[in-house]
């Protein structure tokens, strides 16, 4: 399990004074596997860092299928950008795939911290920058790499995802069926 300080330092080290401001307003919560942390029908007013556990972000397509498009592990963060930016329910669901320990912070409190503490504002910028970069990489990979190449890249860069996340969610994340993923895995 990762400490809040360890997670913050992973992204952007901050002073003890700034960390104390953040830590005082953060609550550690435990949630069970299969908990829907963010529901597309509800506004979620919290931001979470994952201290322990895994999660996925998914949407429901027009045929009623769940389509996973982000997979999370420890040190990642959970946030509904619709909720954060527009204070409205998001279009996505975030489900825990393992029992989890999360650090929870109210979004409005986080925004006030950003306004009053430059180090925390810079931390927020780094989080947003890294999210934008990762999103762009996934998009470009989907456009330019074969399914086999996407799987090999995931295996090389994030072997823990392959070990811990169910294959049906990995297949969905890669944009392929579980049968196709099984074929790819048998050839590697």
Name each model-derived stretch.
Residues 1-27, 83:
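Cyclic nucleotide-binding regulatory module and flanking cytosolic helices
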Residues 28-29, 45-50, 69-70, 173:
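His/acidic/aromatic-lined binding-pocket segments of jelly-roll/cupin-type domains
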Residues 34, 45, 49-56, 75:
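Glycine- and acidic-residue-biased ligand/ion/polar-headgroup-sensing regions
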Residues 37-42:
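Short phosphate-coordinating micro-motif centered on Lys-Gly-acidic
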Residues 58-60, 97:
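A generic structural motif
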Residues 68-126:
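Cyclic-nucleotide recognition modules
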Residues 131-140:
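Short, Lys/Arg-enriched N-terminal segment that forms or immediately precedes the first helix
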Residues 145-188:
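Phosphate-/nucleic-acid-contacting segments
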């Amino acid at each position: 399990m990762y400490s809040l300080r360890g997670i913050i330092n992973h992204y952007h080290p901050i002073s003890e004074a700034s960390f104390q401001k953040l830590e005082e307003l953060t609550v550690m919560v435990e949630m069970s596997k299969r908990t829907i942390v963010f529901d597309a029908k509800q506004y979620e007013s919290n931001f979470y860092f994952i201290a322990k556990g895994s999660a996925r972000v998914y949407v429901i397509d027009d045929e009623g299928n769940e389509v996973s498009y982000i997979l999370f592990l420890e040190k990642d963060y959970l946030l509904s950008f619709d909720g954060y930016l527009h204070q409205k329910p998001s279009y996505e669901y975030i489900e825990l795939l393992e029992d989890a320990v999360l650090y929870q912070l109210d979004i409005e409190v986080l925004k006030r911290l950003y306004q009053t503490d430059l180090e925390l504002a810079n931390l927020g910028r780094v989080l947003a920058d890294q999210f934008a970069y990762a999103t762009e990489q996934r998009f470009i990979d989907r456009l330019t790499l074969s399914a086999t190449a996407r799987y090999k890249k995931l295996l090389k860069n994030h072997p823990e995802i392959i070990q811990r996340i169910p294959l049906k969610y990995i297949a969905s994340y890669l944009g392929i069926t579980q049968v196709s993923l099984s074929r790819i895995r048998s050839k590697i």
